[in-house]
Structure formats: structure tokens, C-alpha cells
Amino acid sequence: MASDDRPLALTLGDPSGIGPEIALAAWRLRGERGVPPFQLIGDPEFLEATAYRLGLSVPVAEVEPDDAVEVFARALPVLPLPSGAKVSATPGAPDTANAGAIVESITAAVDLVRSGAASAVVTNPIAKFVLTRVGFAHPGHTEFLAALAAREGREPPLPVMMLWSELLAVVPVTIHVALRRVPDLLTQELVERTARIVHADLRARFGLEAPRLVLSGLNPHAGESGTMGTEDRDVLAPAVAALRAEGIDIRGPLPADTLFHERARATYDVALAPTHDQALIPIKTLAFDEGVNVTLGLPFVRTSPDHGTAFDIAGKGVAKPDSLIAALRLAQRLAQRPANNVTPFPVLA
């Protein structure tokens, strides 16, 4: 199957959250919003029941991977979980009984891309606490996908989380860790490795010949020459100097409080920030409904909506599919770039 003809693989996400209903809504808007063909990996009967409960006229079709594109025009293609597991969920009430199905859906999506049956992975939101209660050993989606991409017995690749929108793109250097741990984790090596991956993927996947990067400071005023913390002076500044010596266009560390206004944003393509919230607050303020989470550094394309499970509104029919639609469209765009096909899966190399 030609790469342009392959569907996207959309995961189930937490079935008690808004993932299933925004998938249904995205399919309904496929013509109006230019949604590319995708297959959802889950339980067809659960999706049918969800559509019925929400009063949505969405036909659901159980498919094989090769049938998804043809079926997409007339029904939502749902690929059953490989184990045949069934899903039962109450909106807004996460249940550890569904943890196995959630993880299986993610694994199956990666396997579809691995086999060439899908062009990219798009993940619906999960609740990490649901999975950790049953022994899930990864901090989040991003780290689990990196483990799935690793060659057997090898270290997984370093995954880099980029939040992208038309207005702003940001990368948190540290991701799902407590704030008090950041100064110890924020090493010069981590900053340099992260920036190199961002630079490489902006060239290969986004088609930017000379990406412009900027690095936010960790402390107020980027440390004020060491008077408000030494990390900016002793860790971030040397990392920037080393990266510039390699030919990477990066500036910083710069004060975070003046890095995200309109004139500042015009001077760079992606902003790197030391902490999770430094990066995510500005993009969720500017593009809450349109932001997309893109995982860089993997041997396949992965995107996801820039929001969580939203248990508080699940099942009420008010969840917006905008970010999921943006994630689906961006995944297709990135997967169609020829440069994406030059790095095979490690297991196939």
C-alpha cells in the first residue's frame, strides 16, 4: 500500500474520557474539516454505544487494517483490539479495569505503523494514574512510545515533546517530573540532546532548512548573572554555546516572561523551556483548541491532541474535536514527507 493511501492509527485513549466522543465528532466533520482517513483501535460495540448515547448519527464499521480507507467515507472504521477485549466505561469515572485495553490500543497502533499498515500514530488522551495503579512503569504516553520504538535489548530513543500550533511551538526540556527535581535533571547534556533532536526533526519532518531555536531561562530574569540561581549561567548558557558551535541557530537563555509575546515569537520557530509548565502555559493560552502534541526523536510520526481526558465534561456532548482534528491533519502532513521514510524502525534495521 502506498504511503499516501495508508490510514492513520488512532488510539482509544481512556474510554471514560472525551477521546471516544471527539473521535466520533472528528469523523462527522471529515468532509467539512478535511479530516484524513483514520482507523480507531478499540471495541466497535463500545463506539456504537457511545454514538447512540450521545445521539450522534455515526455508523461504526469493524474493519481489517486494509479496509479502513475505503470504509472511512461511509463509516467510522474501528479495528478491534488484538486480544478481542471488550470495553465498558462510564463517562467521567475512570476505571482500572480498562487499563489493559488502553495500553493494548497504543501498542497495536505502533504495530500497525511498524508493519506499514498505517502511516502514523495519533493518540487519544489517557489518565496516567489509571495505568500506574496497575503497574504501568512509564511516566506517560511519550516515554511508553519511546520504549515501544526501541530495538529489543537496546535503550529507547530520547523522546522530545513538542507542542505545535500556527502561533507558537514549544518544547519542555524536562517533562513529567516534579518541579523540585528539575534543577538536578536539567543537565547540559540533556539540553544539548533535546535541541539536536528538535533541530533535526524540524529539518526532516517540518521542512525548515535553517530552524531558529530559542531557550528560555529557568530562573527569573534568566538568573540575573547568577544572583537568582546559577543554572542559567552554569548549565543553559554553556549548552547554547556548544550548540551554536555545531552550527545550530539557538539563542538563550532568555527571560521567560518576555519570550512569548507576538514580536518575540516572530524571531524563532521553536522555544525550548526547562520546565513543563513554562512551555505549556503560553501555548495553551494562545491555542488551547488548536494545539497539537508532536513527539520528536521517534522513528515514526506521533501526534495527539493538546489536552487531557477531560473527565469533568465526558459524556455531555460538549467536548470540542478541534485539537484532535489538528493532530490528525498534522500527522498526515508529516507522514507524507519523504524524509520520514528514511529512518526505519529499529527492529527492521
Residue ranges of each PLM-predicted region?
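Short, flexible loop segments at boundaries between secondary-structure elements
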Residues: A147-V160, W164-L168, L296-D312
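Ligand-binding beta-strand-loop-alpha-helix segment within the catalytic cores
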Residues: L163-E192
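Small-molecule pocket liners
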Residues: F38, T142, P159-V160, L168-V171
